[in-house]
Swiss-Prot record:
Name this polypeptide is given: Large ribosomal subunit protein bL34
UniProt cross-references to PROSITE patterns, sorted A to Z: RIBOSOMAL_L34
Organism: Aliarcobacter butzleri (strain RM4018)
Family: Belongs to the bacterial ribosomal protein bL34 family.
Gene3D superfamilies from the UniProt entry: 1.10.287.3980
Recorded GO CC terms: ribonucleoprotein complex; ribosome
InterPro entries on file: Ribosomal_bL34, Ribosomal_bL34_CS
Amino acid sequence: MKRTYQPHNTPRKRTHGFRVRMATKNGRRVINARRAKGRKRLAV
C-alpha cells in the first residue's frame, strides 16, 4: 500500500506558502497568529 504523504516542494509551496497565505484575509490572519505566537517559521 502506498503511503499518504509523498512530499514534493512545488505543491507544498503552492498551497501553504507565504505568498498564498498573504493572498487572502484569513491567510493573513494565520500569518499574524503565528507572528504573535513567536513561531520561527511563519509559512512552509
